[in-house]
Structures are given as C-alpha cells and as structure tokens.
Amino acid sequence: MKKYIINVISDSAFTVQGHGVHTAYTEHLDGLKKYSPNFEVHTNEKGLKADIVHIHTVGFYGIRFLLSRKCLVFVSAHVVPDSFVGSLVGAKLWYPFAKIYLKWFYNRADGVFAVSQEVADQLKKMKVKSPIYVVPNMLDTEAFASNPKKKAEARKKLKIAKDKFVVVCSGQVQPRKRVDSFLACAKALPGIKFIWVGGIPFKRAAANYNEMQKVMQTAPENVTFTGVIKHEEVIAYYQASDAFFLPSEQETFGIVMIEGASAGLPVLLRDNDQYKITFKDWYLSAHDDKGFIEIIKKLSSDSKYYKMAAQKSSKIAKRYDTKTVMKQINSIYNTDLEKKK
C-alpha cells in the first residue's frame, strides 16, 4: 500500500489552547493515526514535501502552507465572520475585513471542510468557490465514556458530594456563549451544582473581558468556573456530572456537545435551526431561561425523563465518533489524490 504524507497545521499547537478549534485539531491528528493506515502523519512541519496539507487555523501562520501549490491543500472552516462577534474585542468594527480575509483564505484551498451545514451555507453566501464538504468535528467518544465507578472516582477527586445533581457546561467564557443564562439557571436552582469548564484563553483580546471577569467573580455559590484546564481534568468534570447544558446563541458546530453526549449525559441546548440540522432530535431544548430551568429541574427529579434524554443524546456520540467521521475524511482525501495523479 502506497503511503501518502499529510501535514496537519494549527498554530494552536504552540499558541492559545483551551478552545474548540484546538480540540478539533488534536482529534483529527489522533483519528488519522488510528484510522488512516495509508497516511504518514506529520504536524506543523515546515519544508515537508507532503501530498496533503490540512489547515485548521486561519491566522497568518497558516498562510505559508495555504499558498503551497505542490500538494493538495484542505482547510477546515471552524470559523465564519459571525463567530468573532461576541468572542473577540472590537469584532463588529473589523467584521467586514474578516469577511474579506476569510473568503480569500478559503478560496485558496483545494477543498474546504465545513463543520456543519450552516457553515457550508454561510461559505456559499460569502462566495467561496472552492469545493465545500460538510465534515463535522469528531471525538474519541470512548475517552469520555462514564460509568458508576468512574463517576464516583471523578466526584471524589473533584470533591463533589455523591448525592448532588451536577450540570456541566464547557467552553470559553464569553458573551456569545450566554453565560448570563447559565448563571440565571443556577440562581433559580440553588440546590443544583453548576460547573463551567473553561475560562478566557484569549485574555484581554476576548470580548467584554472585564465584564466576564466580574461575572465569574460574582457568580452564585453553587457555580464553579474552572478556568482553562488540562484535557484529562476536563474529562473528569464530564464524568462527575449528570447533565450537559450549553445556552450559547451561536456555534459553528460545538464539539462540546459530543463530549457531553459521550459521557452519557442528557444534552440541553438553546432552540435554534442550526442544531436541528446537526443534532436532529437527539437533544433537549428551550427558547429562554424559564424553559431551561424547567428542563433542568425535571432532569433532576424525574428518572424516566432523565433516562429518555440520555438515550437520545447517545445518538450524538455514535454519529460523531472518530471512527465514523474518519471514513468520510479518508474517502475525500483518497478521491482527490486519485484525481491529482
């Protein structure tokens, strides 16, 4: 079997981590090593004579690899212009320039991996002419899987009471994620523990940095913000929890939903059309804080409802498991390599 060389690029390997794009990059690397036997896998290697370069981050570091015309170049579209609003400081001011830059970047690729159908639609509206493939983010779901023993061990390690109902969220602390809704639910349900796994990795470059710092410092007593932590610790928080809740207004995909589902947790999201396409009816949803509160309260008190919700979310884990998604990725790579011969 001929071995092809692939060079996977992400400046998150040596800059800011603790965000979804970095997780997608590391999961892609692991998936290639595990499920792509005809590829020799490298990452961030300058001067490498590769058959394929696959770029995850759209900063200036990726441009030198993007402009390589000696091999196939793929780019994963994790961000669209709307992703920056409510995430980075001053985004509304430089939004038009971001739109021009991203269009230019994606149009230099031989193929663009849109992480959801909504992203694919936005790329078309931006007039991206490169071939667009809807390829979702993936996750090694086995790493997050939980059971009573793992749950007890995680709770002991994290000093969480055995009988406490725990709601977990994961992501950057930023306005777009609707931290305010998370805290409103916690305030209304003081007997339930709420944990936000994540912090502000981009620090003062993040939108509303000072406001978000104040929000964390003045959160109700039943809320914990972990800050940016190691991957192994993130898994422990999922395994110690009872439900996953992300009230975010906008996500290009949201790998954290797969993490929650993989840990066997019911998944609760804000009601929007994007999620209906990506996650079908495999999650619980509400329009507002009142709806979220009612669902969380029911999950904590109704065992039949809880079991039904957990069974629904297990379909998310199965659909977006690394093994499943890598079959699609390998097919795209191999088809385009054959065309290039």
Regions found by a protein language model. Give the residues of each.
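Glycosyltransferase donor-sugar binding loop
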Residues: 170, 193-211
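Aromatic "clamp/platform" in nucleotide-sugar-dependent glycosyltransferases that forms part
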Residues: 249
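Conserved donor-binding/catalytic core segment of Leloir-type glycosyltransferases
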Residues: 161-177, 183-189, 195-197
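Conserved acidic donor-binding segment of nucleotide-sugar-dependent glycosyltransferases
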Residues: 281-291, 297-304
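Nucleotide-activated donor-binding/catalytic signature segment of Leloir-type glycosyltransferases, i.e.
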Residues: 208-232
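Short alpha-helical donor nucleotide-sugar binding micro-motif in glycosyltransferases
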Residues: 228-229, 236-241
